[in-house]
Amino acid sequence: MNTQPTRAIETSGLVKVYNGTRAVDGLDLNVPAGLVYGILGPNGAGKSTTIRMLATLLRPDGGTARVFGHDVTSEPDTVRRRISVTGQYASVDEGLTGTENLVMMGRLQGYSWARARERAAELIDGFGLGDARDRLLKTYSGGMRRRLDIAASIVVTPDLLFLDEPTTGLDPRSRNQVWDIVRALVDAGTTVLLTTQYLDEADQLADRIAVIDHGRVIAEGTTGELKSSLGSNVLRLRLHDAQSRAEAERLLSAELGVTIHRDSDPTALSARIDDPRQGMRALAELSRTHLEVRSFSLGQSSLDEVFLALTGHPADDRSTEEAAEEEKVA
C-alpha cells in the first residue's frame, strides 16, 4: 500500500456538460483518506458522472480533480494505478467459474499464474465463496455475483475504491454481507467512495456524507452533523386509520406552526419542533378531537428526513425524467 496524503480526493469547480445541460455543475469535494465517504443524491444528480470523471473514464469540461494529489486529466495513468471501480452491474464473465474470473483479473494485472491462483483462492475464501469456487458464474445468486465483482476489483488492493451503488437489487442478507466486506477493506487501509440511494446504507457505512443535487454539493458532514442540522426534535406519529390523516395534519399544523410531513405510510405524519412540550400539547389536542393516535415518538431527525428537507423529495422518489437523465450520463 502506498503512503497516502491526507486527502484521497480533492475537486474544485468540477463540471461536466451533456447536450448543453450541466450534469455536474461546479462540484467541490474534499475526501479524507482512510474512510468511507458517501455521496447521496436523487437520480440525475450527477453521482455516477462524478465517479466516472474521478476514475478517469470521462474528461471534465471544467474545474479540477485530484486523486491522492494527482490530476485526473494530466496524470490519468498514475491515478489509475491507485484506484479501482465497481459499478451497479457485474463486470465479471458469466462463462467462467468464480476462481477463473479472479485468476483472469490477476493475470491482467501482471501476476504470474501461480500468484494469480493464490490471490484468487485468498479472495474466494475471504468473501465466503469457497463452496462455489468451481461453479460457473451464471449459477451464482445476485449477492454472490456482487461479492465476486468486488473481489475482482481488489485483486490488486487499491488505495481508493469507487463503489457506485454496489447493493442495488440485493436482498437484505446480501447487502449486509457487502457492508461487512466494505468495512474490512477500510480497516485494511483502502479509502472507499460510496454512492447509494439507500439512506440506511449510508448511515451504516459512511464516515462522512456529501448530499448532491443538480450536480452540486448542497450539504456535507457526518451523519450526526447532518441530522442535527434540522434541529434535535422530530415528532413522529401514526394514526389509527389513514382516513383521519388530513384532519390530523390540519390540527398539527395549526398547533405547532410548522410544516407537517407525510410519510409513505398513509397513517404516518412527522414534524420538526424546537420544544418537546410543543409535541405533547399537539398530541393532547388530537386526543381532545377524538383522533386516535396508534403510536408516537420524539427523537432526532433521520437521514431520510434530512434528504427530504435538502432535496425536496424522498430518496426513493424516481421521476421518469430523473431516471432517464441518470441512464444517459451513467
Swiss-Prot record:
Q: What class of enzyme is it?
A: translocase
A Gene Ontology molecular function term of the record:
ATP hydrolysis activity
* BP GO annotations: daunorubicin transport; doxorubicin transport; response to antibiotic
Report the subcellular localization: Cell membrane
Q: How does it assemble?
A: The complex is composed of two ATP-binding proteins (DrrA) and two transmembrane proteins (DrrB).
Recorded coiled-coil stretches: none
Q: Name one GO cellular component term.
A: cytoplasmic side of plasma membrane
Q: What is the lineage of its organism?
A: Bacteria, Bacillati, Actinomycetota, Actinomycetes, Kitasatosporales
Q: Which InterPro entries match?
A: AAA+_ATPase, ABC_transporter-like_ATP-bd, ABC_transporter-like_CS, ABC_transporter_ATP-binding, DrrA, DrrA1-3-like_C, P-loop_NTPase
**Protein name, UniProt field:** Daunorubicin/doxorubicin resistance ATP-binding protein DrrA
Ranges for domain ABC transporter come to: 9-239
Q: Which organism is it from?
A: Streptomyces peucetius
Say where the protein is mainly found.
membrane
List UniProt keywords, sorted A-Z: Antibiotic resistance, ATP-binding, Cell membrane, Membrane, Nucleotide-binding, Translocase, Transport
Q: Which Gene3D superfamilies match?
A: P-loop containing nucleotide triphosphate hydrolases
Q: Does the keyword Cytoplasm apply?
A: no
Q: What EC number is given for this enzyme?
A: 7.6.2.2
